[in-house]
C-alpha cells in the first residue's frame, strides 16, 4: 500500500521511500524516513496535492510522489490522544537564566580573537522559522517578513546593534546542507567558502524536531555556534517547555531561548554568540551515532572509515572532515568532485557504502537521514515536553476546513481578492487618493501664485508648474492606492494564507506546466515584478524558474495602478471602476495562462517541479511587519517619484517645449511631437494613434508611472482633456495594452540577472510588446464589430 492510497484521518508507518535524485533526498531531509508515522490531514480541493502531518508539522506533496512511498500499519489516527499523555508539569526556564560553565566546548587551535576585532556571523535556519525577524532585531534593519516558506531569497548583511565590530549575514532558509534549490546553494556556499567566525542557528521551538536536522549538519562544519530557540513564548503559552540546560549539554553548544517577535532573549543571544566566536569554541559534539545500536553502529563505523579514507583530501579541499565524510556517504556529488578521490579510493568507498547498506537494510541516503532523526527523537524525548495540541494548530485546522475546503476554497479566494480590490480601488484607496489630490492641487496653486507674483521667467514657470508639479504630483496622488493594496496583501501573507493559496492552486497550475510554488512569485508580481522575479529562486527546477520569470510580467504590478486609476477615474463612474480593475487583472492572468500553455507545448516541455512545501500555522499579522512593508513600498514609490519620474518629467517637458532649433515651440511642432510621430503609426490600428500617447508609452519603459506623468505634462496638467484623445472604448484598449506591454527597466534587469542572458531579457521585452499589441488589436476589432467606437 502507498501513501497515496490512505484516507484522510488515517495514520500509517512509512516503509520505503521510492523515487530518486534530488526530490527523494529532499523528502528524506524533511523527515520522511522509513519507520516514521504520518497522518493524512487533507486533500486539496482539486484532488491533488495532499497534506500529511509528521514530526509535528504539516507537509504537502503530490499524489504521484506519494504513490512512490510504501506504507504499512494503516489505522485511524490516535495522535492527539497520544500527544496529550506526554505532557508533564515542568518549570519553564527563564529567559536570561545562568548556565553552567561552557566546559563542553572544544577550543579551536590558534589565538583567541581580541575584543574590537572584526567578527562575522552567519544567521542560518529553516525556512519560515523567524530568521529575518531575528535579523531585524539584531541589526535594527527592516527586511520584509512573511509567514511563507522562502521569504529570504538572497543573503543580506547588517551590523549587530551595539557591536560595531560584529556583522551578521541573513542567509536564505534551508532544510539541510544538501542543496535542493538555488537559494539553498547561496547558504551552503557562504558557509563553506566564507568561513564565518560564528553561526547563529535559529530553531523554531514549536517545531524543534525537524529544525534540529539542519542543526546537526551545521555542527559538523566545526564553526563556533550558538542555537537560538525561537518562539519559546508560544511553546510556554501552550503548556509545553524545552529544558534548555539539558539540551545544550546534550548538543554541546549554547542554547538560548528567545522570542524574536517580542525581542526577548536577544541580548543574551548576542553575548553567547560573541563569546563562542572570540574564544573560537566549536561544537563539542559532532558524532550523533549510538555505536551500540544496530543501524546506528553501522552508520558510525561507515562514517569513521570514510573520514579516515578522505582525511588528506578534505584538508586539501578546505572542507571540514566530519562534514565531508557524511556528505560523501550520502552521495553528495559536489563534495565528491571537490575531494578528487583516485580510482582505488573510490572503489574502497563503494565497498564501505555497500557494507553500510547491507547492515542497515537502507540505502546510503536513508541510512544517514534515519541516523539523524533517531538522535533527534532521543534528544527530544529527554528535553522537550509537548502540549497536546497548540492553540495555533487548532485554529489553523478550523480555518482550513473553510479556506482549503473542497467546495469553499476557490470561492473564498475569489471573494477575498475581490474584497481587497473593492476596498483598494472603490473605497479606502480611492477616497484617500482624492484627499491627497486636493492637497497637491492646493500646493500647486500656491506655488503658481508665488512664482507669478515674483515675476519669474515664463519658461522656468512652465518647467516648475507644467512640468514638475503636474508630472510628479499626478503620480504622487496614487500613493494611497498602492499603500492600501500592499496593506491587504501583507496581511494575507503574514497570516499564512498565501501558502494555502499555493496548495489550493497547485493542480490548476500543473495543467499549464507549473507548480503551486510558482503561484507565490506570480502573486508577488501584483506588487512589483522585481522581487517577484527574484522570488523564483525558491523553485528548484530550472525549467519552472524560467517559465515563472516569463509569466510574471503578465501579473499587473502596482506601478501600473496610477495608469488604471487615471483612466478609470476619467472615463467610468465610481461604481464601475473596481469592475474595470478586476477585469484588467483577470485579462493579465488569462493571457499568462495561455502563454504558459504555449511554453509548455513548445520550449519548456516536461513535468513541473514537485510540490513539496511546509504549511505554517495561521498567525495573527504583526503590526510591525505590516507597517514595515507599507513603509518600504511607500518609500520606494516616493524615491521613484522624485528620481526616475522627476527626470522623465523634466525631459518630457524639455522635449515638449522646444523644437529642433531649441526655440520655444507649440507642442505639436516640438521635439517630442517629432519623436512621437515616428512611433504613432504602430498604435493607429489600436485606436490611439496620437503622438502624445505613443510618447507616454515610450517613457513608460523607464517606469510605468511615467505614462501618467508624461500624459499630464503633455495635457498641461488638465487630465480631463484625456476625453479629447480617447473614448471609453479606446481607453479600455489602451489599458489592455499598458497591462501587457514591456516591463520596466528594473524588471528587465532582474530578468537578465536571473535568466543569465541579455538576449533572453531582450526577448522578454519583444515578446511582451508583441503580445500586448496583438491582444489590444483583437479587443479593438471585437469592440468595433460590436459597435463600440
Show which residues each predicted segment covers.
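Alpha-helical transmembrane helix bundles of large polytopic membrane transport and channel proteins
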Residues: 226, 236-387
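Juxtamembrane inter-helical linkers in multi-pass membrane proteins
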Residues: 438, 442-446, 499-529, 605-629, ...
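Core alpha-helical transmembrane segments of integral membrane proteins
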Residues: 403-503
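Hydrophobic core segments of alpha-helical transmembrane domains in multi-pass membrane transport
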Residues: 412-423, 485-490, 568-571, 584-598, ...
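Conserved G1/Walker A P-loop phosphate-binding module
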Residues: 94-176, 194
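Transmembrane helix-loop junctions at the membrane interface of multipass transporters and ion channels
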Residues: 558-581, 746-757, 778-789
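Conserved C-terminal guanine-recognition region of P-loop GTPase G domains, centered on the G4
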Residues: 163, 186-255, 563-564, 568-570
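Extended, low-charge hydrophobic alpha-helical regions
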Residues: 359, 363-370, 386, 427-468, ...
Amino acid at each position: 500500500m502507498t501513501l497515496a492510497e490512505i484516507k484522510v484521518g488515517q495514520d500509517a508507518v512509512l516503509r520505503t521511500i521510492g523515487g530518486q535524485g534530488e526530490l527523494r533526498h529532499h523528502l528524506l531531509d524533511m523527515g520522511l524516513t522509513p519507520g516514521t508515522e504520518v497522518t493524512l490531514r487533507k486533500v486539496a480541493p482539486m484532488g491533488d496535492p495532499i497534506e500529511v502531518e509528521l514530526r509535528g508539522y504539516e507537509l504537502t506533496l503530490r499524489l504521484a510522489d506519494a504513490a512512490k512511498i510504501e506504507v504499512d500499519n494503516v489505522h485511524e489516527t490516535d495522535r492527539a490522544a497520544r500527544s496529550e499523555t506526554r505532557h508533564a508539569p515542568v518549570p519553564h526556564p527563564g529567559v536570561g537564566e545562568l548556565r553552567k560553565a561552557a566546559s563542553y566546548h572544544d577550543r579551536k587551535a590558534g589565538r583567541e580573537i581580541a575584543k574590537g576585532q572584526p567578527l562575522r556571523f552567519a544567521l542560518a535556519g529553516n525556512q519560515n522559522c523567524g530568521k529575518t525577524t531575528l535579523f531585524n532585531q539584531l541589526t535594527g534593519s527592516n527586511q520584509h517578513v512573511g509567514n511563507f516558506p522562502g521569504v529570504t531569497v538572497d543573503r543580506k548583511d547588517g551590523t549587530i546593534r551595539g557591536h560595531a565590530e560584529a556583522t551578521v549575514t541573513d542567509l536564505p532558509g534551508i532544510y539541510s546542507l544538501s542543496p535542493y534549490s538555488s537559494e539553498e546553494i547561496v547558504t551552503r556556499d557562504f558557509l563553506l567558502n566564507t568561513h564565518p567566525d560564528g553561526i547563529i542557528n535559529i530553531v523554531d521551538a514549536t517545531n524543534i524536531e525537524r529544525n534540529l536536522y539542519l542543526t546537526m549538519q551545521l555542527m559538523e562544519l566545526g564553526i563556533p555556534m550558538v542555537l537560538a530557540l525561537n518562539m519559546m513564548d508560544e511553546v510556554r503559552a501552550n503548556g509545553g517547555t524545552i529544558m534548555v540546560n539539558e539540551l545544550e549539554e546534550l548538543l554541546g553548544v549554547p542554547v538560548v531561548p528567545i522570542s524574536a517577535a517580542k525581542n526577548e532573549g536577544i541580548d543574551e543571544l548576542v553575548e553567547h554568540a560573541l563569546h563562542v566566536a572570540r574564544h573560537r569554541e566549536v561544537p563539542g559534539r559532532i558524532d550523533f551515532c549510538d555505536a551500540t545500536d544496530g543501524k546506528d553502529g553501522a552508520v558510525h563505523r561507515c562514517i569513521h572509515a570514510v573520514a579516515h579514507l578522505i582525511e588528506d583530501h578534505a584538508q586539501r579541499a578546505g572542507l571540514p572532515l566530519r562534514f565531508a565524510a557524511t556528505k560523501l556517504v550520502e552521495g553528495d556529488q559536489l563534495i565528491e568532485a571537490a575531494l578528487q578521490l583516485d580510482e582505488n579510493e573510490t572503489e574502497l568507498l563503494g565497498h564501505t557504502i555497500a557494507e553500510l547498506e547491507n547492515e542497515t537494510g537502507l540505502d546510503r541516503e536513508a541510512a544517514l537521514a534515519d541516523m539523524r532523526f533517531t538522535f533527534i527523537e532521543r534528544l527530544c524525548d529527554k528535553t522537550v515536553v509537548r502540549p497536546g495540541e497548540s492553540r495555533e494548530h487548532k485554529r489553523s485546522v478550523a480555518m482550513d476546513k473553510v479556506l482549503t475546503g473542497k467546495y469553499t476554497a476557490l470561492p473564498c479566494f475569489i471573494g477575498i481578492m475581490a474584497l481587497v480590490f473593492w476596498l483598494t480601488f472603490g473605497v479606502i484607496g480611492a477616497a484617500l487618493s482624492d484627499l491627497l489630490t486636493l492637497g497637491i492641487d492646493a500646493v500647486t496653486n500656491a506655488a503658481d501664485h508665488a512664482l507669478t507674483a515674483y515675476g519669474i521667467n515664463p519658461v522656468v514657470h512652465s518647467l516648475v508648474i507644467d512640468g514638475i508639479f503636474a508630472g510628479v504630483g499626478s503620480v504622487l496622488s496614487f500613493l494611497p492606492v498602492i499603500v492600501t493594496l500592499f496593506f491587504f496583501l501583507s496581511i494575507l501573507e503574514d497570516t499564512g494564507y498565501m501558502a494555502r493559496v499555493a496548495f489550493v492552486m497547485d493542480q490548476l497550475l500543473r495543467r499549464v506546466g507549473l507548480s503551486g510554488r510558482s503561484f507565490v512569485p506570480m502573486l508577488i508580481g501584483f506588487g512589483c515584478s522585481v522581487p517577484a522575479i527574484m522570488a523564483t529562486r525558491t523553485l528548484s527546477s530550472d525549467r519552472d524558474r524560467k517559465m515563472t520569470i516569463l509569466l510574471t510580467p503578465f501579473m499587473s504590478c502596482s506601478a501600473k495602478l496610477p495608469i488604471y486609476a487615471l483612466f478609470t477615474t476619467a472615463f467610468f463612474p465610481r461604481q464601475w471602476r473596481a469592475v474595470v480593475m478586476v477585469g484588467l487583472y483577470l485579462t493579465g492572468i488569462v493571457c499568462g495562462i495561455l502563454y504558459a500553455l504555449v511554453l509548455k507545448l513548445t520550449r519548456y516541455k516536461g513535468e513541473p517541479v514537485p510540490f513539496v512545501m511546509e504549511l505554517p500555522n495561521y498567525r495573527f499579522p504583526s503590526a510591525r511587519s505590516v507597517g514595515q512593508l507599507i513603509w518600504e513600498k511607500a518609500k520606494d514609490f516616493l524615491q521613484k517619484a522624485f528620481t526616475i519620474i522627476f527626470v522623465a518629467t523634466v525631459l518630457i517637458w524639455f522635449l515638449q517645449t522646444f523644437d529642433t532649433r531649441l526655440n520655444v515651440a507649440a507642442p505639436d511642432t516640438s521635439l517630442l511631437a517629432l519623436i512621437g510621430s515616428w512611433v504613432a503609426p504602430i498604435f493607429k490600428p489600436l485606436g490611439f494613434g496620437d503622438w502624445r500617447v505613443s510618447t507616454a508609452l515610450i517613457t513608460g519603459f523607464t517606469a510605468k508611472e511615467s505614462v501618467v506623468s508624461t500624459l499630464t505634462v503633455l495635457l498641461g496638467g488638465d487630465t480631463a482633456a484625456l476625453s479629447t484623445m480617447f473614448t471609453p472604448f479606446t481607453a479600455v484598449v489602451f489599458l489592455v495594452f499598458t497591462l501587457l506591454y514591456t516591463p520596466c527597466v528594473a524588471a528587465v534587469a532582474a530578468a537578465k540577472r536571473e535568466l543569465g542572458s541579455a538576449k533572453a531579457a531582450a526577448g522578454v521585452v519583444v515578446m511582451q510588446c508583441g503580445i500586448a499589441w496583438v491582444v489590444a488589436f483583437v479587443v479593438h476589432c471585437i469592440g468595433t464589430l460590436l459597435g463600440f467606437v
